[in-house]
């Protein structure tokens, strides 16, 4: 096993990994877009079953609907008094484009890409039930702002039914928090008992917006639904799956969500409640819904009751999301190597806490990872050197046994045993290192902290490609130099040509990779060159040849 062959193996494994991810990525279908009016809403009917019939989408009476804005230090929400839905969510701490002032818009009521968070009360007496239609709430103000010195801002909206039952819907925004409280207070001033059921759902256009489609050379981030239940910590539920079969699951606690790269919106019911999860693709429209229904609530005449829920609408911040609901942090999807990627992300965060630069933190993490793997690297090159020393004896065996493959294999095994050489010793370390690299790949790809994070000089955003392609070119040059300094006994012309083009192929691939990932690979190559130089000197002192 020569280092060139190992480089080929790394390249093939890595390219295969990317191709597999691209093949497995859940891409949404692309039907013709449908223009949708902002007043259209889909609301579930009450009950504990999974049936979700469509109900009235009209507001009560002829009262004029209004849009109310509420802002904290990290969120700006727009609320529609018809139904009390969140029809817009601006993430004030995250800009749409690097260097610009316009905030990133996660929720929007724009017809070309509708994405809203809806909630209400259905049931026998629910204001959003089929018999009632959607209510139009009243609010004292049209604008609410978290003031200096305040920890939270509350937006109360009220509606009173024909029997005198007062429904107050409150939105609670806390300082520095992307979890929005959505609560109902029910004051039954009527002479009859009232029964209601809370629902919360996310409604989104299925077709992927152009700004989320990514590049063909980079594995696409998942966009679609997801949920967590008692027996399933984290499960994606794609738009295609919603088309094939509606989600119908009853569970204690849990959450339902819509995911995209870096950001997520998720309804988190009370952990002690038994909730019903559902999904639906609206017939004839390019829209999908995922949501939940809470247990029925009975309010006796003259009594009061309160129903609470949480809506996360923001970036994928693992530490904060874990406090909102169990396993909500798993929406930062590291794939099947999550158990490696999570510690790597934690280390990256720790390093950033010291240096306050994500690029430098990546370099520090690379140094640590390659340092830990140094014994494997040394074992790899030592095994390669021992195999090289056996080349004359292996050539003699080939000459001795000719085309007799059975005797040739037997002779080689006896030689390896006698010389205490593991023929796979140069390959196994590579196979051990690949899962670490793949996990680190996803740790960097999924980290919202790297979005718009500067490094140095021209690298102002580690989450996108190098605008001048300097890092990919340097990475390719370092790979070429590493290849040149490595010994070779490859005589097959095809393998030689493949080896010559490997740095070019990798350079081309990395032109579109995030600068943070390219930085990791470049630093890793430089470390490999340094380690290889040190190891070769040590081996030569022991009489093991490192050059052919």
From Swiss-Prot:
TM regions (residue ranges): 6-26, 357-377, 424-444, 455-475, 503-523
Q: A GO biological process this protein is involved in?
A: protein insertion into membrane
Which coarse location class applies to the principal site listed for this UniProt protein?
membrane
Q: Which keywords are on file for this protein?
A: Cell inner membrane, Cell membrane, Chaperone, Membrane, Protein transport, Transmembrane, Transmembrane helix, Transport
CDD domains registered for this protein in UniProt: 5TM_YidC_Alb3, EcYidC-like_peri
Which molecular function terms from Gene Ontology are attached? membrane insertase activity
InterPro entries on file: Membr_insert_YidC, Membr_insert_YidC_N, YidC/ALB3/OXA1/COX18, YidC/Oxa/ALB_C, YidC_ALB_C, YidC_periplasmic_sf
Bilayer topology term: Multi-pass membrane protein
The entry's cellular-component GO terms read:
plasma membrane
Task: Indicate where this protein resides in the cell.
Answer: Cell inner membrane
Q: What biological function has been recorded for the protein in this entry?
A: Required for the insertion and/or proper folding and/or complex formation of integral membrane proteins into the membrane. Involved in integration of membrane proteins that insert both dependently and independently of the Sec translocase complex, as well as at least some lipoproteins. Aids folding of multispanning membrane proteins.
Q: How does it assemble?
A: Interacts with the Sec translocase complex via SecD. Specifically interacts with transmembrane segments of nascent integral membrane proteins during membrane integration.
State the family named in the UniProt similarity comment for this chain: Belongs to the OXA1/ALB3/YidC family. Type 1 subfamily.
Name of this protein: Membrane protein insertase YidC
What organism does this protein naturally occur in?
Aeromonas hydrophila subsp. hydrophila (strain ATCC 7966 / DSM 30187 / BCRC 13018 / CCUG 14551 / JCM 1027 / KCTC 2358 / NCIMB 9240 / NCTC 8049)
Gene that this polypeptide is encoded by: yidC
């Amino acid at each position: 096993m020569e280092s060139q062959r190992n480089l080929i193996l790394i390249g093939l494994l890595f390219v295969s990994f990317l191709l597999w991810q691209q093949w497995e990525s859940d891409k949404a279908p692309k039907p013709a877009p449908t223009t949708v009016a902002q007043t259209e809403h889909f609301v579930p009917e009450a009950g504990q079953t999974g049936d979700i019939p469509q109900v009235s989408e009209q507001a009560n009476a002829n009262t004029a609907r209004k849009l109310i804005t509420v802002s904290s230090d990290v969120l700006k929400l727009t609320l529609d008094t018809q139904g009390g839905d969140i029809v817009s969510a601006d993430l004030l701490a995250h800009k749409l484009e690097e260097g610009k002032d316009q905030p990133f818009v996660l929720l929007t009521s724009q017809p070309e890409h509708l994405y809203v968070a809806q909630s209400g009360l259905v049931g026998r007496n629910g204001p959003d039930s089929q018999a009632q239609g959607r209510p139009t709430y009243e609010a004292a103000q049209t604008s609410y702002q978290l003031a200096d010195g305040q920890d939270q801002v509350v937006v109360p909206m009220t509606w009173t039914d024909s029997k005198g039952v007062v429904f107050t819907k409150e939105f609670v925004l806390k300082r520095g928090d992307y979890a929005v409280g959505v609560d109902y207070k029910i004051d039954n001033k009527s002479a009859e008992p009232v029964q209601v059921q809370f629902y919360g759902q996310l409604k989104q256009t299925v077709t992927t917006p152009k700004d989320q489609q990514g590049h063909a050379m980079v594995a696409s981030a998942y966009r679609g639904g997801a949920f967590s239940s008692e027996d399933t910590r984290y499960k994606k539920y794609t738009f295609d799956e919603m088309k094939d079969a509606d989600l119908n699951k009853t569970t204690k606690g849990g959450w339902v969500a819509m995911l995209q790269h870096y950001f997520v919106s998720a309804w988190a019911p009370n952990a002690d409640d038994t909730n019903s999860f559902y999904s639906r693709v609206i017939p004839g429209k390019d829209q999908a819904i995922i949501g939940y229904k809470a247990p029925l609530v009975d309010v006796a005449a003259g009594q009061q009751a309160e129903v609470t829920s949480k809506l996360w609408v923001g970036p994928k911040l693992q530490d904060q999301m874990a406090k909102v609901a169990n396993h909500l942090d798993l929406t930062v999807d590291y794939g099947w190597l999550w158990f490696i990627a999570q510690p790597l992300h934690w280390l990256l965060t720790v390093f950033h806490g010291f240096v306050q630069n994500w690029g430098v933190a990546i370099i520090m993490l690379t140094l640590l990872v390659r340092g830990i793997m140094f014994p494997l690297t040394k074992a790899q090159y030592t095994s390669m050197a021992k195999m090289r020393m056996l080349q004359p004896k292996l050539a003699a065996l080939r000459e001795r046994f000719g085309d007799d493959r059975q005797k040739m294999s037997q002779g080689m095994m006896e030689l390896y045993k006698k010389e205490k050489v593991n023929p796979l010793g140069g390959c196994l370390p590579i196979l051990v290192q690949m899962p670490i690299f793949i996990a680190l790949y996803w740790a960097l790809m999924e980290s919202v902290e790297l979005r718009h994070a500067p490094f140095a000089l021209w690298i102002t955003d580690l989450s996108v490609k190098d605008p001048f392609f300097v890092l990919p070119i340097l990475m390719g040059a370092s790979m070429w130099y590493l290849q040149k300094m490595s010994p070779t006994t490859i005589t097959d012309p095809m393998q030689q040509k493949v080896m010559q083009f490997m740095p070019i192929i990798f350079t081309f691939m990395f032109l579109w990779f995030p600068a943070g990932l390219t930085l990791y690979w470049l630093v890793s190559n430089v470390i490999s060159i340094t380690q290889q130089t040190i190891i070769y000197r040590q081996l030569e002192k022991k009489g093991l040849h490192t050059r052919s």
